Amino acid sequence: TEGKTDVRYLKAALMKLYTQYPSLIEKDDTGRFIFKIKFFQRSKRWKYFFGMSLDGGDAMKVLYRYFTGKKGAKDYFSYFQRITGRRQLSPVILLYDNEIESKKPLKAFLNEDAGITELQKQELKNNLQLRLLPDSTLFLLITPLTAGKAECEIEDLFAPDLLGLTLDGKTFSRKDKPNKDKHYGKEIFFEYVLTNYQSIDFQGFIPLLDALNSIVENCKSSTT
């Protein structure tokens, strides 16, 4: 994902809608949620050894290059398949905000690294997902467009009344460094979402979760 709060939003949405996605999450007898997919945790160690930034979309470009050997990166995908004699089974999914046209991380990734065709771009727009390499389970996943918007960030999947919520006299700002006298940022917004996930409307997330579930289900069926 592009940002650390993106993963948290997804987890909150899955917790609310867990009965619809048994391949992605389940709830045990004690009421504890168990995620059946793993979310990549960025760290200083990953940054030191592999050059992956702690935030933003650049880390996913770096990961993609380790699958392809592009831009001078080592092709770890082929290397480990060769030395283990096993093919990759579980999908690796790169989640981007749906900002194909503007100068944002997704457009840069598509133009500078993935180099997809216009036909593939249309497939991505229609299905919200695209297999990036023919012989792998590396996928690109993007957020759905909402309310007739030409582009969409993951926060746009929340209902407008939630995005307009006032907390302690402050309104929500998506900026990295909001004016703290007037606005609260993504961290506080997420804490509110997590605390109140049972009452929050996650309907806007369903197309994204459906696409994610489709990738997982298809990869699972291809290995059985």
Describe these PLM feature segments.
Residues T1-T224:
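Acidic, divalent-metal-binding catalytic cores of TOPRIM
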